[in-house]
Amino acid sequence: MRRLVTAVVTAALATGVLAGCGSGDNWAKKCTTKDTVVECAPDRRTPIKQDVKGQLLDGTAYDLAGDKGKVVVVNFWGSWCAPCRAEADDLEKTYQETQAKGVAFLGIDSRDDKDAAKAFARGRATYPSIYDFDGKVAQQFDVTQVATPQTLIIDRQGRIAYAIRGATVYTQLLPMVQKVAAEAHPTAPPTALKSTKGSS
């Protein structure tokens, strides 16, 4: 009976939405929403907090600041989530194809049993995941709603470029990640114009 009650409570929390987690000025209002995708043009992006920290499933510490200057793809998931299982291979495939281009992936596992989460990630994802049972780490990202699954693409300046509200697939995710990764690095010097002086 106790297990049944725990399962019901966990499922209720899992399917719920964390509301009011971001700032009062919702960054998404400045962006374009089409279906389940929010796209923010570079001049419309809002920086997220850079002190996002948590403990990974293997027990080691993670700090978002360690990925500064990279494009970071953040996926919110749970082992209890059927759409999360469906998108897992597509996320891993995208990660493998983009990590050499300065792209990092991070999973946020919420409302989950830790052993079940480890079993889910094993063989599915080679990138790290934070264990976030109570959703506190998810709240550190400036989003007013965190449903599961959901994927954020954060640019090299620490701003949300895309939010995919729901499951994603390789053919959708890869072009988005590539587009953000191709943007000029914030510390890159301006390209010098080739002089045409003295040319005939």
Predicted regions span which residues?
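Structural microenvironment flanking redox-active thiols in thiol-disulfide oxidoreductases
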Residues: 85-124, 133-140
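Short active-site neighborhood of thiol/selenol oxidoreductases, capturing the structured segment around
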Residues: 62-85, 91
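Residue-level recognition of short loop/turn positions
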Residues: 58-60, 157
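Short loop/turn microsegments at loop-to-beta-strand junctions
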Residues: 49-50, 72, 148-149
